[in-house]
Amino acid sequence: MPRRREVPKREILPDPKFGNVDVAKFVNVLMLSGKKSVAENIIYGAFEHIQTKSGKDPLEVFTAAIANCKPLVEVKSRRVGGANYQVPVEVRPVRRMALSMRWLREAANKRSEKSMPQRLAGELLEAAESRGGAMKKRDEVHRMAEANKAFSHFRF
């Protein structure tokens, strides 16, 4: 590993419409090929769908969905004596947020609605109620960690 100083984290500016840093991060997660305006339109469209579908505040639904999808533990492979063990480790807060957003994006992509804003709105509403594909992924990761609890003494 290089012995240079640690590179400082970049400051992410809050998004222009809601003034929320998490929404800005999610825009960056959704963005493909540097097309930020397209990603913003998808998110703002999804927020409009949430407003019309449920009548709830879209920002509250978004924060609830992200909070519900955050994993507490995950498994990492560790090689000990010629065997690979899946060792459960606690997830750092920054990674929790990143995984949560990534799983929401992937679950929304797999849905069958016609447009991406509709798919994202549906997934966010379901995740806010602890249902949906992203929640299924989080529960699967938690189950894996629970099943491999016996190897937790192989700490990193």
From Swiss-Prot:
Origin: domain of life: Bacteria
Please give an example of a GO cellular component term from this record: small ribosomal subunit
InterPro entries on file: Ribosomal_uS7 (IPR000235), Ribosomal_uS7_bac/org-type (IPR005717), Ribosomal_uS7_CS (IPR020606), Ribosomal_uS7_dom (IPR023798), Ribosomal_uS7_dom_sf (IPR036823)
One Gene Ontology BP term is: translation
Known SUPFAM superfamilies for this protein? Ribosomal protein S7
Q: Would you indicate the residue range of the signal peptide?
A: none
A GO molecular-function annotation: tRNA binding
Going by the UniProt record, its keywords in alphabetical order are: Ribonucleoprotein, Ribosomal protein, RNA-binding, rRNA-binding, tRNA-binding
Q: Which purpose does this protein serve, as stated in its record? A: One of the primary rRNA binding proteins, it binds directly to 16S rRNA where it nucleates assembly of the head domain of the 30S subunit. Is located at the subunit interface close to the decoding center, probably blocks exit of the E-site tRNA.
Per UniProt, subunit arrangement is: Part of the 30S ribosomal subunit. Contacts proteins S9 and S11.
**What family does this belong to?**
Belongs to the universal ribosomal protein uS7 family.
The name of this protein is Small ribosomal subunit protein uS7
- Protein source organism: Janthinobacterium sp. (strain Marseille)
